[in-house]
């Protein structure tokens, strides 16, 4: 059912951006105005500048948060602040955090997913969407020609759990700890056999969007 593919990920260059904790940001829809300003102060390369840039009183069609983000993305790529991986990969992501005084781990994979109409029930929603946030994310997508944040989806398949566990024993390509104490580790899975196993595990089932309905639409 769900068709997934590896892709060439873009990420911060650790040789030029040593403190990854200073450049990561939360999802756009939970960033308050105060948090936005703090993230700007934290680093000239904080990702909020692309994901949810500041608006100004002088914004216009040719100079606004979307055009500024587009210009900045091009600059970061030209300056090697951001690097594009040579090989397509499935990216394994482990997040460790504390919730209600309990230590938790969230494990996921970041992949490309073929867009499907809701009526096909391949990708399934659980909530409606609003025009304003949908328009905001679409404007950013058009300006950058890139996705700045993933759509969080759920699926159940215990068959690939051992494969992901094996991959997680290797050295992560990226590792960071947020100011709130959450730790993140990312591995790039590039072996064709491993990628095929992951693709096959999802080929017979739907996936359920947990967060990101506006961006999917």
Language-model region placement:
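A cross-family signal for N-terminal binding/gating loops and helix N-caps
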Residues: 1-217
């Amino acid at each position: 059912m769900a068709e997934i593919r590896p892709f060439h990920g873009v990420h911060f260059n650790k040789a030029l951006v040593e403190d990854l904790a200073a450049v990561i940001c939360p999802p756009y829809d939970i960033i308050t105005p105060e948090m936005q300003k703090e993230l700007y102060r934290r680093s000239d390369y904080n990702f909020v500048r692309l994901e949810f840039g500041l608006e100004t009183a002088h914004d216009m069609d040719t100079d606004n948060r979307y055009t500024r983000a587009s210009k900045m993305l091009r600059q970061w790529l030209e300056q090697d602040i951001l690097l594009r991986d040579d090989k397509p990969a499935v990216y394994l992501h482990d997040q460790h955090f504390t919730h209600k005084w309990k230590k938790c781990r969230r494990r996921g994979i970041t992949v490309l997913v073929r867009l499907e109409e809701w009526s096909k029930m391949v990708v399934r929603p659980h909530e409606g969407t609003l025009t304003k946030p949908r328009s905001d994310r679409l404007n950013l997508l058009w300006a950058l020609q890139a996705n700045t944040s993933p759509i969080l989806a759920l699926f159940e398949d215990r068959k690939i759990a051992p494969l992901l566990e094996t991959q997680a024993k290797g050295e992560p390509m990226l590792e960071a700890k947020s100011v709130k104490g959450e730790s993140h580790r990312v591995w790039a899975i590039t072996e064709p056999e491993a990628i095929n196993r992951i693709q096959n595990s999802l080929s017979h089932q739907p996936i359920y969007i947990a967060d990101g309905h506006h961006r999917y639409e």
